[in-house]
């Protein structure tokens, strides 16, 4: 089940969201940014929805605040005010996935949350594959270094064998009166 965190200063919006999506998603709601951070710390949240206009900090400011510690959840900004500056800020600072206007349409929002969760899991899979690839590359470097050392040892061994043969050849020549 998709874990969704919804931050909004208006409790009735949170109640409506929980009622609409409690069967579809694992819904976490709060009016407080500090509580939202606690939820992020304790739960694997895939999608975060935040209202833009809140008294303590804006949705964009909240996303900026959590980005360093929680970069993976997919972020969506929800607002009843079409503010182009907020949209630009959200895109540039908060790295939002979607900007959603209030009032939201239940089926559209459900689809957006599902798409966002899919993106979350694709990114995680890619990160895992990237880490595995980096491990394989590291192992390949170690193996290549080992081969270079063995080749260098073999080359120096061949040089010493050649020196021994030359020395013995000289001794044989001396013995034969050469």
Predicted feature residues:
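C-terminal output/effector regions of signal-responsive regulators
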Residues: 128-178
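Acidic, metal-coordinating helix/loop segments flanking the phosphotransfer/catalytic sites
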Residues: 29-47
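Acidic catalytic/metal-coordinating carboxylates
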Residues: 31-32, 58-61
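Receiver (REC) domain active-site loop signature in two-component systems and cognate sites
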Residues: 54
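C-terminal output helix
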Residues: 83, 104-113, 117
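Hydrophobic/aromatic residues positioned on beta-strands within the core alpha/beta folds
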Residues: 78-79
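Conserved acidic segment of CheY-like receiver
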Residues: 1-12, 16-21, 48-49
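Short amphipathic alpha-helix used as the core "switch/output" element in two-component signaling
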Residues: 38, 60-72, 89
């Amino acid at each position: 089940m998709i874990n969704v965190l919804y931050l909004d200063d208006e409790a009735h919006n949170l109640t409506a969201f929980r009622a609409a999506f409690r069967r579809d998603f694992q819904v976490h709601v709060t009016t407080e940014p500090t509580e939202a951070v606690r939820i992020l710390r304790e739960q694997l949240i895939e999608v975060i929805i935040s209202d833009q206009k809140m008294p303590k900090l804006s949705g964009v400011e909240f996303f900026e605040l959590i980005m360093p510690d929680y970069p993976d959840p997919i972020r969506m900004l929800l607002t009843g005010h079409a503010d182009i500056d907020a949209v630009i800020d959200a895109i540039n600072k908060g790295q939002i996935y979607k900007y959603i206007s209030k009032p939201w349409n239940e089926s559209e929002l459900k689809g957006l949350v599902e798409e966002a969760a899919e993106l979350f899991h694709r990114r995680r899979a890619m990160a895992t594959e990237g880490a595995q690839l980096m491990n394989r590359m590291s192992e390949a470097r170690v193996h290549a270094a080992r081969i270079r050392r063995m080749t260098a040892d073999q080359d120096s061994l061949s040089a010493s064998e050649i020196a021994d043969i030359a020395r013995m050849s000289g001794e044989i020549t001396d013995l034969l009166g050469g």
